[in-house]
Amino acid sequence: MSHHWGYGKHNGPEHWHKDFPIANGERQSPVDIDTKAVVQDPALKPLALVYGEATSRRMVNNGHSFNVEYDDSQDKAVLKDGPLTGTYRLVQFHFHWGSSDDQGSEHTVDRKKYAAELHLVHWNTKYGDFGTAAQQPDGLAVVGVFLKVGDANPALQKVLDALDSIKTKGKSTDFPNFDPGSLLPNVLDYWTYPGSLTTPPLLESVTWIVLKEPISVSSQQMLKFRTLNFNAEGEPELLMLANWRPAQPLKNRQVRGFPK
C-alpha cells in the first residue's frame, strides 16, 4: 500500500515518487529561496492573519509529525490578503525538524537550513471543506515560519509540554485555548510561490507564504521534538528524529517577495 511512506532510508522522500508520481511534478515543495532571484511584486499586500477567535481542539501524533487541530467550521481563524484572493481558514499547524540543530527546516534561504519549520495550514473557504480545497490549485495556503536556535520560546513550550501524552502514532490529547498567533514573529514580511504539500499525497494546491523573520527555539526545546515516536504503541520504537523533505527543483516558478 502507498501508506508506508516515511523518512527512513527505505521509505523516505527519495522513494515517494513510486507511490506518488506527482513527487516529480512541476510545482513541488519545499524549495530553496535564492534571495538574489526573488521578484519584488508591487501587487502583493501585507498579510492579514486574523486569529483572535481561534479555537484549538486537540493535538494528534499522526506518525510523521504532530498536528494541533483547530475548529474550522466557521471563520474563526483566517488568513487573507498577502498574495491571496479570498479567505482561508486555519485547520491545523505542525512542525518539521531535524536530528540536529543545523538542519530540519524544509524551505531553505540561500541554502541555509534552520533547526525546524512551523506550518500553519489554511484552506480556501470557497471550496467548502479542506478535502475539496486540497484538490484545487488555489485551495490551500500554508504559512511557513522558521525556528532559529537561540532563546527558549515560551509560547512553543506550551506545545512541547503536551508531547509526553502523544508519544506514539495515533495518540491524541485535548489541547484547548492555544493562540496560534503566539507562534508568529513580530514582522510578517514574506516570500511567496506556488507549491505543494511537503508530505504525501504531495498535492500541488498550496500557495506558500514563507515568513522572512524566524522565531526562536532553544536547543533544549529542540530535544523535546525528537522524543516523539513514528511508531504506534506496542511496535518497535522508532524515534521521530527527523521529518523534513529536502528542497525540490524550482522549475518554471518565481518566488516573489513582500515588501518591495
From Swiss-Prot:
GO cellular component: apical part of cell; cytoplasm; plasma membrane
Gene3D superfamilies found in the cross-reference section: Alpha carbonic anhydrase
Highest taxon in the source lineage: Eukaryota
Keywords: Acetylation, Cell membrane, Cytoplasm, Lyase, Membrane, Metal-binding, Phosphoprotein, Zinc
Reported cofactor(s): Zn(2+)
Domain spans labelled Alpha-carbonic anhydrase: 3-259
Control of this protein's activity: Inhibited by acetazolamide.
Known catalytic reactions: hydrogencarbonate + H(+) = CO2 + H2O; urea = cyanamide + H2O
PANTHER family named in the record: CARBONIC ANHYDRASE, CARBONIC ANHYDRASE 2
The protein's name: Carbonic anhydrase 2
